[in-house]
């Protein structure tokens, strides 16, 4: 789950990696979920522009609060199949780092 904004340069820099990860692991049950608070019309345009192939939900105070009141963006949580947060990253994180956590989780049918 990636908390981001269209005006955030590090957020924008991460998106191609998320697109690649979504494409690579979708058939194993993996989904990137973006969370943005700018509103559907802004986000839809941005998603088309960057070729985002994963869902983006509109954030609200409850969603942000559920994840510990996000204080910086991008902030990304890797969540396992049970819904447990495995790890969190604040600031730009590269695709290889995300994959190093995601790939083993997908191999483990319990996690």
Regions found by a protein language model. Give the residues of each.
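Hydrophobic beta-strand core positions in alpha/beta domains
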Residues: 2, 34, 77-78
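Conserved redox-active cysteine motifs that mediate thiol-disulfide chemistry
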Residues: 3-20
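Short pre-active-site segment immediately N-terminal to redox-active cysteine/selenocysteine motifs
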Residues: 3-7, 39, 72
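Pocket-edge positions in alpha/beta enzyme catalytic cores
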Residues: 7-10, 35, 90
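Conserved protein kinase catalytic core
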Residues: 8, 42, 86
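Conserved segment of the thioredoxin-like fold in thiol-based oxidoreductases
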Residues: 13, 20-61, 73
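Thiol/disulfide oxidoreductase modules built on the thioredoxin-like
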Residues: 45-53, 58-104
């Amino acid at each position: 789950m990636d908390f981001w904004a269209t005006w955030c340069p590090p957020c924008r820099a991460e998106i191609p990696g998320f697109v690649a990860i979504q494409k690579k692991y979708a058939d194993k049950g993996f989904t990137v979920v973006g969370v943005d608070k700018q509103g559907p019309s802004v986000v839809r345009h941005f998603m088309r522009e960057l070729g985002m192939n994963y869902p983006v939900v509109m954030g609200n105070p409850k969603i942000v609060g559920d994840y510990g009141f996000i204080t910086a963006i991008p902030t990304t949580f890797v969540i396992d199949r049970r819904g447990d947060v495995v790890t969190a990253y604040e600031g730009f994180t590269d695709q290889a780092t995300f994959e190093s956590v995601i790939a083993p989780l997908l191999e483990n049918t319990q996690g």
